Amino acid sequence: MYLVVGLGNIGKEYKKTRHNIGFDVVDIIAEKYNIEINRQKFKGSYGEGRIGNEKIILLKPSTYMNLSGESVIEAANFYKIDKENIIVIYDDMSIDIGKLRVRGKGSAGGHNGIKNIIQHLNSDIFPRVRVGIGQPDENVVNYVLGKFSKDQREIIDKVLAMSAKACISIVEDGVTEAMNKYNGVKIEV
Protein backbone atom coordinates (compact mmCIF):
# COMPACT_ATOMS: atom_id res chain seq x y z
CA MET A 1 0.00 0.00 0.00
CA TYR A 2 1.18 3.50 -0.86
CA LEU A 3 0.26 6.93 0.44
CA VAL A 4 0.64 9.54 -2.31
CA VAL A 5 0.62 13.06 -0.88
CA GLY A 6 0.37 16.25 -2.90
CA LEU A 7 1.38 19.41 -1.07
CA GLY A 8 -0.55 22.61 -1.64
CA ASN A 9 -2.78 25.22 -0.07
CA ILE A 10 -6.55 24.93 0.15
CA GLY A 11 -8.74 27.66 -1.28
CA LYS A 12 -9.70 28.85 -4.76
CA GLU A 13 -7.19 31.69 -4.60
CA TYR A 14 -4.32 29.15 -4.56
CA LYS A 15 -5.58 26.99 -7.43
CA LYS A 16 -2.95 26.60 -10.19
CA THR A 17 -0.28 28.48 -8.20
CA ARG A 18 3.33 27.31 -8.04
CA HIS A 19 2.92 26.12 -4.45
CA ASN A 20 -0.04 23.90 -5.41
CA ILE A 21 1.81 21.67 -7.83
CA GLY A 22 1.45 18.70 -5.49
CA PHE A 23 -2.35 19.02 -5.49
CA ASP A 24 -2.33 19.26 -9.30
CA VAL A 25 -0.30 16.05 -9.69
CA VAL A 26 -2.54 14.15 -7.26
CA ASP A 27 -5.56 15.33 -9.27
CA ILE A 28 -4.00 13.93 -12.47
CA ILE A 29 -3.41 10.54 -10.80
CA ALA A 30 -6.95 10.57 -9.39
CA GLU A 31 -8.42 11.24 -12.83
CA LYS A 32 -6.31 8.55 -14.52
CA TYR A 33 -7.31 5.87 -11.98
CA ASN A 34 -10.89 7.05 -11.30
CA ILE A 35 -10.19 7.84 -7.66
CA GLU A 36 -12.52 10.33 -6.02
CA ILE A 37 -10.75 12.55 -3.49
CA ASN A 38 -13.90 13.37 -1.60
CA ARG A 39 -13.43 12.07 1.93
CA GLN A 40 -12.44 14.33 4.81
CA LYS A 41 -10.11 12.83 7.41
CA PHE A 42 -6.45 13.00 8.44
CA LYS A 43 -6.60 16.82 8.32
CA GLY A 44 -7.10 16.62 4.58
CA SER A 45 -9.07 15.30 1.62
CA TYR A 46 -8.35 11.78 0.46
CA GLY A 47 -9.47 8.93 -1.74
CA GLU A 48 -8.61 5.26 -2.12
CA GLY A 49 -7.91 3.32 -5.28
CA ARG A 50 -5.50 1.02 -7.07
CA ILE A 51 -2.55 1.29 -9.39
CA GLY A 52 -2.37 -2.22 -10.80
CA ASN A 53 -2.45 -4.59 -7.83
CA GLU A 54 -1.23 -1.95 -5.38
CA LYS A 55 -3.69 -0.09 -3.16
CA ILE A 56 -3.03 3.65 -2.99
CA ILE A 57 -4.32 6.45 -0.83
CA LEU A 58 -4.25 9.90 -2.46
CA LEU A 59 -4.04 12.69 0.13
CA LYS A 60 -4.25 16.47 -0.12
CA PRO A 61 -3.53 17.93 3.34
CA SER A 62 -5.80 20.82 4.33
CA THR A 63 -3.43 22.10 6.99
CA TYR A 64 -1.20 25.06 6.32
CA MET A 65 1.70 23.97 4.11
CA ASN A 66 4.18 24.11 7.00
CA LEU A 67 1.98 21.72 9.04
CA SER A 68 1.58 19.06 6.33
CA GLY A 69 3.29 16.48 8.51
CA GLU A 70 0.27 16.38 10.82
CA SER A 71 -1.91 15.14 7.97
CA VAL A 72 0.69 12.71 6.59
CA ILE A 73 1.42 11.02 9.93
CA GLU A 74 -2.30 10.58 10.71
CA ALA A 75 -2.95 8.85 7.37
CA ALA A 76 0.25 6.78 7.55
CA ASN A 77 -0.54 5.60 11.08
CA PHE A 78 -4.18 4.82 10.28
CA TYR A 79 -3.28 2.68 7.25
CA LYS A 80 -0.01 1.38 8.79
CA ILE A 81 1.98 2.51 5.75
CA ASP A 82 5.78 2.19 5.83
CA LYS A 83 7.69 5.45 5.41
CA GLU A 84 9.30 4.04 2.27
CA ASN A 85 5.81 3.84 0.74
CA ILE A 86 4.88 7.47 1.36
CA ILE A 87 5.38 9.49 -1.84
CA VAL A 88 5.29 13.28 -1.49
CA ILE A 89 4.94 15.63 -4.47
CA TYR A 90 5.87 19.29 -4.10
CA ASP A 91 7.27 22.42 -5.75
CA ASP A 92 11.01 23.08 -5.65
CA MET A 93 12.63 26.46 -6.39
CA SER A 94 16.10 24.92 -6.74
CA ILE A 95 15.00 23.03 -9.86
CA ASP A 96 14.39 24.78 -13.20
CA ILE A 97 10.92 24.94 -14.71
CA GLY A 98 10.56 21.99 -17.06
CA LYS A 99 12.35 19.51 -14.80
CA LEU A 100 11.49 17.22 -11.96
CA ARG A 101 13.62 15.18 -9.62
CA VAL A 102 12.72 11.86 -7.99
CA ARG A 103 14.47 11.05 -4.72
CA GLY A 104 14.17 8.21 -2.22
CA LYS A 105 15.28 10.32 0.73
CA GLY A 106 16.91 13.60 1.62
CA SER A 107 16.72 16.88 3.46
CA ALA A 108 13.88 19.40 3.28
CA GLY A 109 15.97 21.71 1.09
CA GLY A 110 14.30 24.74 2.64
CA HIS A 111 10.73 23.53 1.95
CA ASN A 112 8.73 24.01 5.15
CA GLY A 113 6.11 21.41 4.25
CA ILE A 114 8.79 18.74 3.77
CA LYS A 115 10.58 19.88 6.91
CA ASN A 116 7.37 19.29 8.90
CA ILE A 117 6.81 15.87 7.31
CA ILE A 118 10.38 14.82 8.17
CA GLN A 119 9.79 16.01 11.73
CA HIS A 120 6.51 14.07 12.11
CA LEU A 121 7.80 10.88 10.46
CA ASN A 122 11.05 11.20 12.40
CA SER A 123 12.78 10.26 9.16
CA ASP A 124 13.83 11.71 5.82
CA ILE A 125 13.66 8.30 4.14
CA PHE A 126 10.52 8.58 2.02
CA PRO A 127 10.23 8.98 -1.77
CA ARG A 128 9.46 12.36 -3.20
CA VAL A 129 8.83 13.95 -6.56
CA ARG A 130 10.22 17.49 -6.63
CA VAL A 131 8.73 19.60 -9.40
CA GLY A 132 10.84 22.53 -10.58
CA ILE A 133 9.33 26.01 -10.38
CA GLY A 134 12.59 27.93 -10.89
CA GLN A 135 14.19 30.75 -8.92
CA PRO A 136 12.18 33.89 -8.19
CA ASP A 137 13.19 37.36 -9.33
CA GLU A 138 10.86 38.70 -6.68
CA ASN A 139 9.75 38.09 -3.11
CA VAL A 140 9.73 34.31 -2.47
CA VAL A 141 6.24 34.27 -0.91
CA ASN A 142 4.74 36.24 -3.80
CA TYR A 143 6.52 33.94 -6.24
CA VAL A 144 5.38 30.59 -4.82
CA LEU A 145 1.83 31.86 -4.34
CA GLY A 146 1.79 33.34 -7.85
CA LYS A 147 0.62 31.73 -11.05
CA PHE A 148 2.72 30.64 -14.01
CA SER A 149 2.98 32.81 -17.13
CA LYS A 150 1.26 31.51 -20.28
CA ASP A 151 4.57 30.16 -21.66
CA GLN A 152 5.47 28.56 -18.33
CA ARG A 153 1.98 27.05 -18.03
CA GLU A 154 2.49 25.20 -21.31
CA ILE A 155 5.67 23.62 -19.94
CA ILE A 156 4.27 23.01 -16.45
CA ASP A 157 1.21 21.13 -17.74
CA LYS A 158 3.57 18.66 -19.44
CA VAL A 159 5.77 18.43 -16.33
CA LEU A 160 2.72 17.77 -14.15
CA ALA A 161 1.75 14.86 -16.42
CA MET A 162 5.33 13.57 -16.28
CA SER A 163 5.33 13.95 -12.47
CA ALA A 164 2.18 11.83 -12.23
CA LYS A 165 3.89 9.18 -14.37
CA ALA A 166 6.93 9.34 -12.07
CA CYS A 167 4.71 8.66 -9.04
CA ILE A 168 3.08 5.75 -10.83
CA SER A 169 6.54 4.44 -11.76
CA ILE A 170 7.60 4.55 -8.09
CA VAL A 171 4.57 2.40 -7.20
CA GLU A 172 5.00 -0.04 -10.11
CA ASP A 173 8.78 -0.19 -10.56
CA GLY A 174 10.41 1.32 -7.45
CA VAL A 175 12.24 4.57 -6.70
CA THR A 176 15.50 3.68 -8.48
CA GLU A 177 13.74 2.88 -11.75
CA ALA A 178 11.69 6.10 -11.53
CA MET A 179 14.88 8.10 -10.86
CA ASN A 180 16.61 6.55 -13.88
CA LYS A 181 13.62 7.23 -16.10
CA TYR A 182 12.66 10.80 -15.09
CA ASN A 183 15.64 12.58 -13.53
CA GLY A 184 17.45 14.66 -16.11
CA VAL A 185 14.51 14.97 -18.52
CA LYS A 186 13.79 18.60 -19.44
CA ILE A 187 10.53 19.72 -21.01
CA GLU A 188 10.67 22.80 -23.22
CA VAL A 189 8.11 24.65 -25.32
UniProtKB/Swiss-Prot annotation:
Catalytic residues identified in the record: 19
GO molecular function: peptidyl-tRNA hydrolase activity; tRNA binding
PROSITE patterns named among the record's database cross-references: PEPT_TRNA_HYDROL_1, PEPT_TRNA_HYDROL_2
Site positions (Discriminates between blocked and unblocked aminoacyl-tRNA): 9
Short name of any one Pfam family annotated for the protein: Pept_tRNA_hydro
Biological function: Hydrolyzes ribosome-free peptidyl-tRNAs (with 1 or more amino acids incorporated), which drop off the ribosome during protein synthesis, or as a result of ribosome stalling.
NCBIfam families listed in its UniProt record: pth
Name listed for the protein in its UniProt record: Peptidyl-tRNA hydrolase
Source organism: Clostridium botulinum (strain Okra / Type B1)
